A protein has these predicted regions:
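Beta-strand-rich extracellular passenger or scaffold domains
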Residues: 42-520
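Bacterial Sec-dependent N-terminal signal peptides
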Residues: 1-41, 45
């Protein structure tokens, strides 16, 4: 992690050399306040002899152009325009041997400055700069005001009392906003190149103080530390916001927001392709999830006063806490119980062992996952929905065509498994009248009862010995029967076009009839 702007500076008189020299005051902890650079008064400057390489721009004076190199100092109480700064950081991060650079004192102004590698611009309290461009290896230490800084791989460290407005952070650039500092209208274009939620920490924007109206674009990242606050942030696709502190009124326009343990997010709006993730110990309040947006609340996470609009997705488990409203009214997930949850467009509810869900509505694109020992009652499954369960769960509900289904006491009946759905039959259990429409039926032993139907895209996976004393029917389209053995006095019937592929399976049935199609 880069550190060399985590330093405040002061000018002191060296009695041996008879010159002004720079003394740094290091802040060893990035979250702690550093010493404040001492602003020189005009009287102090004029009373101190300076070397030829050290220049002073007096109050009321304007200097245009020039280059600072080789530890030169420019002390600005007037106005400096168009300077190039190539000195001040030659010795690297937090090195007290660093001297030189541009000093903007109380009342001083610098415009259109270029800071190259190894260069440092220091803006003390009461000083102001505008339109500074900082390249890789260069930096700006800010205790005054800076407007329209561009970080092309360079760094801007905003100390207590400093205000940075309109900073643009490009690839490998870094803005650190310390406690007591403010950054407004920042544009972040870097920091997330390491992938979602990767804590790069040395690029993008790191907030210990306050960040207001930040725009996070593709590859951009804002990290809000435990003591930091971000207000009115907009995150676009490919960008993300990592919250350990406080985030207020964030809008996710395809971007991601991660709320970590101890972090809080209030008033987040999740639009199409946006994703808010609440991790264990994280808290979200008053989140609004619009169509194609997603709210994910992990085990131990909390989201309250959620507004889940039609087409929005909720991803959670009964180990989380989520309360709010959806298109059917109020819903809740708390204390191991879920009620009136709507799942669609990538939404998913995991019902854990010993936990309960009631009145669950699983619409197109939604998934209900009931673990062994979990219970779900009054379930509504619509076309395009997904059920994940095994015979150790307890489930009752209906499909949108009116068909009823149930799982309980090791017996399943009336299941229809569409694409993505998986039912696992455990040894010693049974399933009756199961229809597999592109989903998967996995049997670790057990018994197939009634008519088991495999339609196009269906998979029946056997492990061990499974008994079929009734009828296994394969209709239109292709299906796969793989592994294990199928025994008993039942029959296998292939009808309709398509191919039944039998792979590593032993069939011991009363009859195997190929009426139409192909058996391979």
């Amino acid at each position: 992690m880069k550190r060399h702007l985590n330093t405040s500076y002061r000018l002191v008189w060296n009695h041996i050399t008879g010159t002004l020299v720079v003394a740094s005051e290091l802040a060893r902890s990035r979250g702690k306040g550093a010493g404040v650079a001492v602003a020189l008064s005009l009287a102090a400057v004029t009373s101190v002899p300076a070397l030829a390489a050290d220049t002073v721009v007096q109050a009321g004076e304007t200097v245009n152009g020039g280059t600072l190199t080789n530890h030169d100092n420019q002390i600005v109480l007037g106005t400096a325009n168009g300077m190039t700064i190539s000195t001040g950081l030659e010795y690297g991060p937090d090195n007290e041997a660093n001297t030189g650079g541009q000093w903007i004192q109380n009342g001083g102004i610098a415009n259109n400055t270029t800071v190259t590698g190894g260069g440092l611009q220091r803006v003390n309290a009461g000083g102001s700069v505008s339109d500074t461009v900082i390249s890789a290896g260069g930096g700006q230490s800010l205790q005054g005001q800076a407007v329209n800084t561009t970080l092309n791989g360079g760094e801007q460290w905003v100390h207590e009392g400093g205000i940075a407005t309109g900073t643009v952070i490009n690839e490998k650039g870094w803005q650190a906003v310390k406690s007591g500092a403010v950054a407004t209208d920042t544009v972040v274009n870097t920091g997330a190149e390491g992938g979602p939620d990767a804590e790069n920490g040395d690029t993008g924007q790191t907030v210990y103080g306050d960040a207001v109206r930040t725009t996070i674009n593709k590859n951009g990242r804002q990290i809000v530390t435990a003591e930091g606050t971000a207000n009115t942030t907009v995150v676009y696709a490919g960008g993300d916001q990592t919250v350990h502190g406080h985030a207020l009124d964030t809008t996710l326009n395809g971007g991601y927001q991660y709320v970590h343990n101890g972090g809080t997010a209030s008033g987040t709006v999740v639009n199409s392709d946006g994703w808010q993730i609440i991790k264990e110990g994280g808290l979200a309040d008053f989140t609004t999830v619009n169509q194609k947006g997603k709210l994910q609340v992990n085990a131990g996470g909390t989201a309250t006063n959620v507004t889940l609009k039609q087409g929005g997705a909720l991803v959670t488990s009964t180990a989380a806490t989520v309360t709010g409203s959806n298109r059917l009214g109020n819903f809740s997930v708390e204390n191991g119980m879920a009620d009136n949850v709507v799942l669609e467009n990538g939404g998913c509810l995991d019902v854990l062992s010993g936990h309960t869900a009631t009145n669950t509505h699983v619409d197109e694109g939604g998934t209900l996952d009931v673990r062994s020992g979990g219970t779900a009652t009054t379930v509504s499954m619509r076309a395009g929905s997904v059920l994940l369960a095994d015979s150790g769960a307890s489930i009752s509900g209906h499909y949108d065509d009116g068909g009823m289904f149930s799982i309980g006491d090791g017996r399943a009946a009336g299941l229809t498994l569409g694409a993505g759905s998986v039912f696992t039959l455990q040894e010693g259990d049974s399933t009756r009248d199961t229809t597999v429409n592109g989903g998967q039926l996995t049997a670790h032993g057990g018994t197939l009862e009634g008519t088991t139907t495999l339609n196009n895209g269906a998979t029946l996976t056997l492990s061990g010995k499974t008994v079929n004393n009734d009828t296994l029917t394969i209709r239109e389209g292709d299906a796969l029967l793989q592994g294990g053995s199928l025994t008993g006095n039942g029959s296998v019937e292939k009808s309709g076009s398509g191919t039944l592929t039998v792979s590593n399976t032993t069939l011991t049935q009363k009859a195997v009839n190929l009426n139409e199609g192909t058996l391979t």
